[in-house]
Amino acid sequence: MSERIRVRYAPSPTGYLHIGNARTALFNYLFAKHYNGDFVVRIEDTDSKRNLEDGESSQFDNLKWLGLDWDESVDKDKGFGPYRQSERAEIYNPLIQQLLEEDKAYKCYMTEEELEAEREAQIARGEMPRYGGQHAHLTEEQRQQYEAEGRKPSIRFRVPKDQTYTFNDMVKGEISFESDNIGDWVIVKKDGVPTYNFAVAVDDHYMQISDVIRGDDHVSNTPKQLMIYEAFGWEAPRFGHMSLIVNEERKKLSKRDGQILQFIEQYRDLGYLPEALFNFITLLGWSPEGEEEIFSKEEFIKIFDEKRLSKSPAMFDRQKLAWVNNQYMKTKDTETVFELALPHLIKANLIPENPSEKDREWGRKLIALYQKEMSYAGEIVPLSEMFFHEMPELGKDEQEVLQGEQVPELMNHLYGKLESLESFEATEIKKMIKEVQKETGIKGKQLFMPIRVAVTGQMHGPELPNTIEVLGKDKVLSRLKNLV
């Protein structure tokens, strides 16, 4: 592309960074970086009543954690600020006045009750609710009368009649809207605060945003924004609307969906890796060429192609997320995974709050046992239950394993060998098991399966010598003694 690419992610601090917004930020970031452009983070904070105290800081913190480095924002002003809408009144106000003077906007004094009554009547008649234009041509005398009554006006944009607004969506193709289906809409609320569709169009123009990539739910906002560009004689940016994210039942992903965690913070807390979430979310509604699914951030930037954004809804597959994160977990060094897992082990009272070096060394060995199968760091707690709790009650299959005629001899032999081991380490335990095999003649499954069931209560698990080492001599001997 010949022009400089400038895109924006514009969150509201009324909430925290969730999967949908993270995807919006991510696709904008990849698009900008692919074309050596600018990724701008703008804060849309005009809804002061709903803004959360830590809403803004949480957005930035989680974007940074995901690896999205912005080029411009409240902390990096490159001459296009302010980057908070609440600080841009000096930009909005003259433009609003201009629209009023050019009769492209007007003051509307209708009350909320009057507007609601109109809306209900339209619905009752089977009509699409829209403002009927009752105050579109008030006389000066009527305006003064409403002012005298203490009514505060909103300001509405005067929608042109019989006009078609068309744009070529980079995802959906050509989309058109008829202006006659859109009532005169509010650009300034009664409290004097500009509405979303006015402010966002002004901000995108003054910040020289070249491309607007956002969720499917913003398609209906586009004609209103195009009206603002037209009213001021500005060139509109290109638009692209990403497909919905749906759950495994093909229903729109909702914050009320109890099956899927919605917020990036929740995945951080569970011990997911940021690069894994980056990878997984990028594949929600976009696909690379070929079959490969694991890419680094740098690789994604290189191969990102907006033409491969999908029109079809993207399914949030929890098993796929677990698989992707597991691929990254396997490549990490044990120390990194241990540090991620440590808070979970402490919270479950499995490791002391202030672990000694001996505790930490034991924890590293525990992680090494399960690292290849862990989907996230916090999963170490349910995976490693056998190390912290009493032997579980054996199931039918496990009981059958221990009923083999060779088992009593095997257990007695094993107990004696383990008891006499001076160095209770995996390498020595492995040698000792080979000695038991040689001395008893028991081998294969008939050797290993009874030992595993006897010391862990399970038929499957990590490497047996390593498992025995991590369980510790006292616990293993106690379990064998109870069995014998």
From Swiss-Prot:
CDD domains: GluRS_core (cd00808). One of its GO terms (biological process) is glutamyl-tRNA aminoacylation. It catalyses: tRNA(Glu) + L-glutamate + ATP = L-glutamyl-tRNA(Glu) + AMP + diphosphate. Its EC number is 6.1.1.17. It is found in: Cytoplasm. Pfam families: Anticodon_2, tRNA-synt_1c. Keywords: Aminoacyl-tRNA synthetase, ATP-binding, Cytoplasm, Ligase, Nucleotide-binding, Protein biosynthesis. One of its GO terms (cellular component) is cytosol. It is an enzyme of class 6 (ligase). ATP binds at residue 255. One of its GO terms (molecular function) is tRNA binding. A motif ('HIGH' region) lies at residues 11-21. A motif ('KMSKS' region) lies at residues 252-256. InterPro entries: aa-tRNA-synth_I_cd-bd (IPR045462), aa-tRNA-synth_I_codon-bd_sub2 (IPR020751), aa-tRNA-synth_I_CS (IPR001412), aa_tRNA-synth_I_cd-bd_sf (IPR008925), Glu-tRNA-ligase_bac/mito (IPR004527), Glu/Gln-tRNA-synth (IPR000924), Glu/Gln-tRNA-synth_Ib_cat-dom (IPR020058), GluQ/Sye (IPR049940). Monomer. PANTHER family: GLUTAMATE--TRNA LIGASE (PTHR43311), GLUTAMATE--TRNA LIGASE, MITOCHONDRIAL-RELATED (PTHR43311:SF2). Belongs to the class-I aminoacyl-tRNA synthetase family. Glutamate--tRNA ligase type 1 subfamily. Catalyzes the attachment of glutamate to tRNA(Glu) in a two-step reaction: glutamate is first activated by ATP to form Glu-AMP and then transferred to the acceptor end of tRNA(Glu). This is Glutamate--tRNA ligase. It comes from Staphylococcus epidermidis (strain ATCC 35984 / DSM 28319 / BCRC 17069 / CCUG 31568 / BM 3577 / RP62A). The gene is gltX.
